[in-house]
């Protein structure tokens, strides 16, 4: 029987070590995990874990546990030591705080050891745990650490202590794009550049499988070269396989958030990378326009505009935006299904907006940025806002009574870009000493090889540098040659233009002289004519005196009148010609001046060009000499380089042979090692097999021998008993013998096999010995090769030394050769100089020849000019003769004109009479004007006097109030004076009312006139339509006549001609009618425009009068209250009561409230600005004044009717999320009717309220779905309605601004109260006001709430709006955005 092979090892076999085999592989894997910086159990994570455990357990309450105490006793000291050795905040000097947020701040720091500047971000662990979100920073850390992209801000290291997380990042001194947009008006060229860089940066983030979700200018930083990098990756989210993201909360900044992300707050948040392209569209719009496209003062307004983006997106008319830019913005700000970029970044890159000649998508980062920041030092932080010091107490974790684990969420945060831990330890340790020695030797050889290669590369670099120098010199020479050629061509062109200009100048001078002569001649003629006219007039006067009695002279007078008319006509023609000549003379003189200035400029340019040419020639000569010297140096250097290259090539060949030998040795070594291992395995296998077989055979033999012995004993005992049976069993005995023989043969075979195995083992031992010998030989060879390498390195070093010596010798020899062969070189240089001089002289000779030819040409031109001048002189002489003849003729004419004196005399009399009439009219107008001015000044004086009287009266009133106990008589006098003043003021009020009525009547008249003009316009339009119909009918008739087929026999040429004449007549009539119609249209349009302007002026005057009347009313009201107070004071003084009982506890009279409040001004899209106004609340009006002077002058900025007030309430952070958090307790809001406002016209339009399509109607409310990231409570259940990162779905009414959970609406709960606001939201406006303190705010709100009418009045269709313009108005006054309605005041 055969047994199965044993499973265990042989008792005599050696046991393997625990680190060998599979165990070593596992250890290597574990070590790789510890070394990997991305692994969650790397060295830094393990140290963080130990550190955080000690920090979380080191509390008195926890130390009571024995196990915790033992753990702390064991690890506390070593952890403290680790903390001391790790990086900490004390390793950096803080330069400045450059940013602050909800979780911490960003500091500009300098590393103490390296003196490098970084930006260090501090995140408070307490704040992150408190706000139940400590995971957002992981994405930011991982992206900045492992991105390795030029578009992402790099993280150098991250560490932590018990309070803060620290991220040391690269410092971006250019600041963010918000700062750039606030300092510059960004042109489209810049916007194109920065948008392209943002696109590439987002593509880098998307290629990492992430979506940013908070793309805005605040997160776009500029480096020292002005190029853009993205930052703040806390909102990033990993995409799934389809490139989409599942998220149930809206993440991002309100102005830049996309509609699909807003919709995610309902629970169906499924969107992709296209949400980032939406933000890019908003960013581009903001750069070009200066404002975000969906701006609103409240979150609700912003979100509603984003959801209704198809209607709310519009481009302002006052800013110029190209078609491509508008197209790109519209392509980004659209639904995600059709948004640009949904199919990849390539479709964005192909958009025509990005086409330009300066950069492309591949080299944009290498090109110069539009704005490169001007930095004074490496710590220049001028592009960041100054941050105030945070004086608040730093909150920390409370001491726990049980294990909390506050430090556990931050394990693994520590990171170092250049991690030195475990850097020197080898990747795998082997137990074999030979292999470690070999690896060390191979490392040494590799180091030497690296050194040799570095030496070689340095030599190659030196060679390349020399070649580059030569190339640069050659390029410079070529450039200078080209510049010289260009200068020569320029000079030639300038000279030619000079010649042309000189010719033109000469011609113009000639023309000018001619025109001057003609003008002088005409002036002489005019003078003569005027003298003649005067003489004729004198004669006329004489004749008039003589012939006053006679009536016969009328015919002569008529004749003279005709002659005088003719003379006047001649005079006019002469004066016209004289004026024309003067104009032509002036124009020619201007042309001459321009030509002279051009000539001077060209001469200056010529001089500059000549100087530049000389400089260039000098530079050319210097460069040629430098080139020759460089060529010599180059040839010399090339010889040295060739020698060195030869030596280097030899050394390289030696190195190659050495490397080849090393490689062969290593290969043989590996092969022998493999053979050895194979033989050892075979040997061990054979030994095991042989021992097993021997054991089996021995066992079988022993069994057989035992059986044989027993059978023999049995046979011997039974021989005597069974003698008769021996014969029968002889055959069995024979068989047994046969079996014995077979067993013996098997035993011999096994012994033979054993002998063969022993022989094989001996052979293998021999082979092993031989291989060991070979290995030793190879090791010796390796040692020899190492020695050869060392010798080679020594040789290389010797060669380098020799090379240095050779170079020194060469320098010495070159110096000697230079000194010895100076004469030869000088001769050669002189020869070269002479050759160059020869060349230059030849060039100069050719140039002089050219100049001579040019001079000859100029001489010819001058001769031509001289001939022309001679010709002109002859012409002038002939013209002078002709002029003399003309003069003689005109003298004859003058003599004839003298006979026509009487007509001229009559005309002069009539003209004199007309002049007297006009003079009298002018005098009367001037008198009227002076009277009006005097009246105006008198009125102003009266106004000033009245104001002064009121002031004096007030002063007297105050004095009398103080001295009321002394004299009751004085009080009575003041009472009388006050009553008289009140009467005067009442009269003034009546006058103003009368004026107002007059203005209203005038307005109604103007409206009637406008209506009549409109009716006339309608009539003319009807006439125009009739004319057009008649025209079309006539054209159709003509077409019929033209297309009508008539028989040839009937027709004749006369009929055709007659019809053509009729047609022409009709056309002429049509043209004349059209001209008349257009003239009438223009006339009536002008009249209409004038009427509209008059109406506008009248309405402005009316509003001004109304506002002054309101202010006067408030003054009268105040005076009446003071009078009442005086009467009460007089009564009380008679009874014996003390003064000042009339006022309430708050210090203001019950009927009057006044003080300083601030109105919002929108300086930018990020924050509110405020402007102070003096506000007075009377019983009927709220008056706003720019200053106290305006108050005294009764010039209010704005007036609100108290009857039109709807609501007054304090605001929350969600209502004014752009305002500073410190200002919110001091802000309150007024809601009022649109028609209840009188105000100076703002410089921007008030936006209309959106449609009701996106609102949920319930109990009179108009709810808008929204989210609250700021502290807010539900007004239905009073539970929190906000969360920093995952806020619950909420609703806000756009009418009363009540806020509640969306679940109340979905579950149809009756908790929500009905809407309290009953007014029409489209006719309502709101106004934010800032008080000086919270107490004042409460006082203003409480007092104004009392004045609100219980039922607001219906809006007046004919109520006044306020188109009055004034330069005093503040720009961007924030009484805008009617969509931002605030909630009603909560019950106090």
From Swiss-Prot:
Phosphotyrosine modification, residue list: 722
Domain RhoBD, first and last residues per copy: 979-1047
Modified residues (Phosphothreonine): 414, 1212
GO cellular component: centrosome; cytoplasm; glutamatergic synapse; neuromuscular junction; nucleus; plasma membrane; postsynaptic density; presynaptic active zone
Record region (Interaction with NPM1): 373-420
Residues recorded as bearing Phosphoserine in the entry: 1137, 1362, 1374
InterPro entries xrefs: AGC-kinase_C (IPR000961), C1-like_sf (IPR046349), HR1_rho-bd (IPR011072), Kinase-like_dom_sf (IPR011009), PE/DAG-bd (IPR002219), PH-like_dom_sf (IPR011993), PH_domain (IPR001849), Prot_kinase_dom (IPR000719)
Location of the active site: 214
REM-1 domain location: 497-573
PH domain location: 1150-1349
Stimuli inducing this protein: Expression oscillates in a circadian manner in the aorta.
Disruption phenotype: Mice exhibit both EOB (eyes open at birth) and omphalocele phenotypes as a result of disorganization of actomyosin cables in the eyelid epithelium and defective actin assembly in the umbilical ring. Mice are impaired in both basal synaptic transmission and hippocampal long-term potentiation (LTP). Embryos manifest extensive thrombus formation in the placenta, resulting in placental dysfunction, intrauterine growth retardation, and fetal death.
One GO-annotated biological process of the protein: regulation of synapse maturation
Binding-site positions, ATP: 98-106, 121
The keyword Phosphoprotein appears for this protein: yes
Domain AGC-kinase C-terminal, first and last residues per copy: 357-425
Tissues of expression: Highly expressed in brain, heart, lung, liver, stomach, spleen, kidney, testis, muscle, embryo and placenta. Isoform 2 is expressed predominantly in the skeletal muscle.
Subunit details: Homodimer. Interacts with IRS1. Interacts with RAF1. Interacts with RHOA (activated by GTP), RHOB and RHOC. Interacts with PPP1R12A. Interacts with EP300. Interacts with CHORDC1. Interacts with BRCA2. Interacts with NPM1; this interaction enhances ROCK2 activity. Interacts with SORL1. Interacts with PJVK.
Protein name: Rho-associated protein kinase 2
Organism: Mus musculus (Mouse)
Gene name of the record: Rock2
């Amino acid at each position: 029987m055969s047994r199965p092979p044993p499973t265990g090892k042989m008792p005599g076999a050696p046991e393997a070590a625990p680190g060998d085999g599979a165990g070593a592989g596992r250890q290597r894997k574990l070590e790789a995990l510890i070394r990997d910086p991305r692994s969650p159990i790397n060295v830094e994570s393990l140290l963080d874990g130990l550190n955080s455990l000690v920090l979380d357990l080191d509390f008195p309450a926890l130390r009571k546990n024995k196990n915790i105490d033992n753990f702390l006793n064991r690890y506390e000291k070593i952890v403290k030591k680790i903390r001391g050795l790790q990086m900490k905040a004390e390793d950096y000097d803080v330069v400045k705080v450059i940013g602050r947020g909800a979780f911490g701040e960003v500091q500009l720091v300098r590393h103490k050891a390296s003196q490098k500047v970084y930006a260090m971000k501090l995140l408070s662990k307490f704040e992150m745990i408190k706000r139940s979100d400590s995971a957002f920073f992981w994405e930011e850390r991982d992206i900045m650490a492992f991105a390795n992209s030029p578009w992402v801000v790099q993280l150098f290291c991250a560490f932590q202590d018990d309070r803060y997380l620290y991220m040391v990042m690269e410092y971006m001194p250019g600041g963010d794009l918000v700062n750039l947009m606030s300092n510059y008006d960004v042109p489209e060229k810049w916007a194109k550049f920065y948008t392209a860089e943002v696109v590439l940066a987002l593509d880098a983030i998307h290629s990492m499988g992430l979506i940013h979700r908070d793309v805005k200018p605040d997160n776009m930083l500029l480096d020292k070269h002005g190029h853009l990098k993205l930052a703040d990756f806390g909102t990033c989210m990993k995409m799934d396989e389809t490139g989409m993201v599942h998220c149930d909360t809206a993440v991002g900044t309100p102005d830049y958030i996309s509609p699909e992300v807003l919709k995610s707050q309902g629970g169906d948040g499924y969107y992709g990378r296209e949400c980032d392209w939406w933000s890019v569209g908003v960013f581009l719009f903001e750069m070009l326009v200066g404002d975000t496209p969906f701006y609103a003062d409240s979150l609700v307004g912003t979100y509603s505009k984003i959801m209704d983006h198809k209607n709310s997106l519009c481009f302002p008319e006052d800013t110029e935006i190209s078609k491509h830019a508008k197209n790109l913005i519209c392509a980004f700000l659209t639904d995600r299904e059709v948004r640009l970029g949904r199919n990849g970044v390539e479709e964005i890159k192909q958009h025509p907006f990005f086409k330009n000649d300066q950069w492309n998508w591949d080299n944009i980062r290498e090109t110069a940025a539009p704005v490169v920041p001007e930095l004074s030092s490496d710590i220049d932080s001028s592009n960041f806002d100054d941050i105030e010091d945070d004086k608040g107490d730093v909150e920390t974790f409370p001491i726990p009574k049980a294990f909390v684990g506050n430090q556990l969420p931050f394990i693994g945060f520590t990171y170092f870009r250049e991690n030195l831990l475990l850097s020197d330890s080898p990747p795998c340790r082997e137990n074999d000493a030979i292999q470690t020695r070999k690896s060390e030797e191979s490392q040494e050889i590799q180091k030497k090889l690296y050194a040799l290669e570095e030496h070689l590369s340095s030599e190659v670099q030196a060679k390349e540098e020399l070649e580059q120098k030569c190339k640069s010199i050659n390029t410079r020479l070529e450039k200078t040659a080209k510049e010289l050629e260009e200068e020569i061509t320029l000079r030639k062109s300038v000279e030619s233009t000079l010649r042309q200009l000189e010719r033109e100048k000469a011609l113009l001078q000639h023309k000018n002289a001619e025109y001057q002569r003609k003008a002088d001649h005409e002036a002489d003629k005019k003078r003569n004519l005027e003298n003649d006219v005067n003489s004729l007039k004198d004669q006329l006067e004489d004749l008039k005196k003589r012939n006053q009695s006679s009536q016969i002279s009328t015919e002569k007078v008529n004749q003279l009148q005709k002659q005088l008319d003719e003379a006047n006509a001649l005079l006019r023609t002469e004066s016209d010609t004289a004026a024309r000549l003067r104009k032509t003379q002036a124009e020619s003189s201007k042309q001459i001046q321009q030509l002279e200035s051009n000539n001077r400029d060209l001469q200056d340019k010529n001089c500059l060009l000549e100087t530049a040419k000389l400089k260039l020639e000098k530079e050319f000569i210097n460069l040629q000499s430098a080139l020759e010297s460089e060529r010599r140096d180059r040839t010399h250097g090339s010889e040295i380089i060739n020698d060195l290259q030869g030596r280097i090539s030899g050394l390289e060949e030696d190195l190659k042979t050495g490397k080849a030998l090393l490689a062969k040795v290593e290969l043989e070594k590996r092969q022998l090692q493999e053979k050895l291992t194979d033989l050892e395995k075979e040997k061990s296998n054979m030994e095991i097999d042989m021992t097993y077989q021997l054991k089996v055979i021995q066992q079988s033999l022993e069994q057989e021998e035992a059986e044989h012995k027993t059978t023999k004993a049995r046979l011997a005992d039974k021989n005597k008993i069974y003698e008769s049976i021996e014969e029968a069993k002889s055959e069995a005995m024979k068989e047994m013998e046969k079996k014995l023989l077979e067993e013996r043969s098997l035993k011999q075979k096994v012994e033979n096999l054993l002998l063969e195995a022993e022989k094989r083992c001996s052979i293998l031992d021999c082979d092993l010995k031989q291989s060991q010998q070979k290995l030793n030989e190879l090791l010796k060879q390796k040692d020899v090769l190492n020695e050869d390498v060392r010798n080679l390195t020594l040789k290389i070093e010797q060669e380098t030394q020799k090379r240095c010596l050779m170079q020194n010798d060469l320098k010495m020899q070159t110096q000697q050769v230079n000194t010895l062969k100076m004469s030869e070189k000088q001769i050669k240089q002189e020869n070269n100089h002479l050759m160059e001089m020869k060349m230059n002289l030849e060039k100069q000779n050719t140039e002089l020849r050219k100049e001579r030819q040019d001079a000859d040409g100029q001489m010819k031109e001058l001769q031509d000019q001289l001939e022309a001048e001679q010709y002109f002189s002859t012409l002038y002489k002939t013209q002078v003769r002709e002029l003399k003849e003309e003069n003689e003729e005109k003298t004859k004419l003058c003599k004839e004109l003298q006979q026509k004196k009487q007509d001229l005399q009559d005309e002069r009399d009539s003209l004199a009479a007309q002049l007297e009439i006009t003079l009298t009219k002018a005098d009367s107008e001037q008198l009227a004007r002076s009277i009006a001015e005097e009246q105006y000044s008198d009125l102003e004086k009266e106004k000033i006097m009245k104001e002064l009287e009121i002031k004096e009266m007030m002063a007297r009133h105050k004095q009398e109030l103080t001295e009321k106990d002394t004299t009751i008589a004085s009080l009575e006098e003041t009472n009388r004076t006050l009553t008289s003043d009140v009467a005067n003021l009442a009269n003034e009020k009546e006058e103003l009312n009368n004026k107002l009525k007059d203005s209203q009547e005038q307005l109604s008249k103007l409206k009637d006139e406008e209506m009549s003009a409109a009716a006339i316009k309608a009539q003319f339009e009807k006439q125009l339509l009739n004319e057009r119909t008649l025209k079309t009918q006539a054209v159709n008739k003509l077409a019929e006549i033209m297309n009508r087929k008539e028989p040839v026999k009937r027709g004749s040429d006369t009929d055709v001609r007659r019809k053509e004449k009729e047609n022409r007549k009709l056309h002429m009539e049509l043209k004349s009618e059209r001209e008349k119609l257009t003239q009438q249209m223009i006339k009536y349009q002008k009249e209409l425009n004038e009427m509209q302007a008059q109406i506008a002026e009248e309405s402005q005057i009316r509003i001004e009068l109304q506002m002054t009347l309101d202010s006067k009313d408030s003054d009268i009201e105040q005076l009446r209250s003071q009078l009442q107070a005086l009467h009460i004071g007089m009564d009380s003084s008679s009874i014996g009561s003390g003064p000042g009982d009339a006022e309430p506890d708050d210090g203001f009279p019950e009927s009057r409230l006044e003080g300083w409040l601030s109105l919002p001004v929108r300086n930018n899209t990020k924050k509110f600005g405020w402007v102070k106004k003096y506000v007075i609340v009377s019983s009927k009006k709220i008056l706003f004044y720019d200053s106290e002077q305006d108050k005294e002058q009764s010039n209010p900025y704005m007036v609100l009717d108290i009857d039109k007030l709807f609501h007054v309430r304090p605001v929350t952070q969600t209502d004014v999320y752009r305002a500073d958090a410190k200002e919110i307790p001091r802000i309150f809001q007024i809601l009022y009717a649109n028609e209840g406002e009188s105000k100076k016209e703002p410089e921007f339009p008030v936006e209309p309220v959106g449609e009701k399509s996106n609102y949920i109607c319930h109990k009179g409310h108009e709810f808008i779905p929204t989210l609250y990231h700021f502290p807010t409570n539900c007004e239905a259940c009073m539970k929190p309605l906000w969360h920093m990162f995952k806020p619950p779905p909420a609703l806000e009414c756009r009418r009363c601004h009540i806020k509640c959970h969306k679940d109340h609406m979905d579950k149809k709960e009756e908790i929500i109260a009905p809407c309290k606001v009953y007014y029409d939201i489209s006719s309502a406006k709101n106004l934010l006001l800032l008080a000086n303190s919270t107490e004042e705010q409460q006082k203003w709100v409480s007092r104004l709430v009392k004045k609100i009418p219980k039922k607001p009045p219906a809006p007046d269709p004919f109520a006044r709006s306020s188109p009055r313009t004034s330069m005093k108005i503040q720009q961007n006054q924030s009484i805008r955005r009617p969509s931002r309605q605030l909630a009603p005041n909560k019950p106090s």
